[in-house]
Amino acid sequence: MSETAESGSSKEMADHEAERVFLAVVDDSDEMPIALHFACRRAEHTDGRVALFYVPAKADFQHWMAVGDLMREEAREAGEELLQRQSAEVQRKTGKVPILFIREGDRSEELIKLMDEEPNISILVLAAGTEDSGPGPIISYLLGKGARRLHVPITIVPGSMTVDEIDAIT
């Protein structure tokens, strides 16, 4: 099941056809703010716009349907709060309200579906994880099984970069 937030409708995207749209994935990772800052700086310098994408964590509790539904609703509410905080940050940095997308399902699959559905998304901006376990699940998926389905360039920002380093290159 997938869903596009009202503020991320195809109509709104069509209204901004001339704008370059930088899509950033919102999550609670340490490196996410780095990717978001990079997307904001690029949007600011190219008269573009930032779009934020969020998929709540799946509720694994299947024993009682009502409990699973409650867990999904709580995860969605937490995600909406996170999106609102990041949206305010994007607006502060770029002067433009970002486009918001909330989906349910597998995050990597929903990300590819979104990029297929929204032709105005110009670039996907991700930050690589800083842990020894690798760059992160989305990057690993997109560079592996998902690579053949991509039609949007990806910018991978090292998660260890600082805001000052990003500012210097953007």
Annotated model-derived regions:
Residues 1-13, 17, 91-124, 164-170:
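Structural beta-alpha unit
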Residues 3-4, 8, 12, 54-81, ...:
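Acidic, proline/glycine-rich short linear motifs
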Residues 34-38, 113-114, 142:
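A short acidic, amphipathic alpha-helical/loop segment
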Residues 51-53, 99-103, 155-157:
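General small-molecule cofactor/ligand-binding pocket signal
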Residues 71-99:
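Helix-adjacent hinge/juxtasegments
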Residues 126-148, 163-167:
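Glycine-rich, Arg-bearing micro-motifs that act as flexible, cationic patches
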Residues 145-159:
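Short, acidic/small-residue loops that bind anionic groups at enzyme active sites
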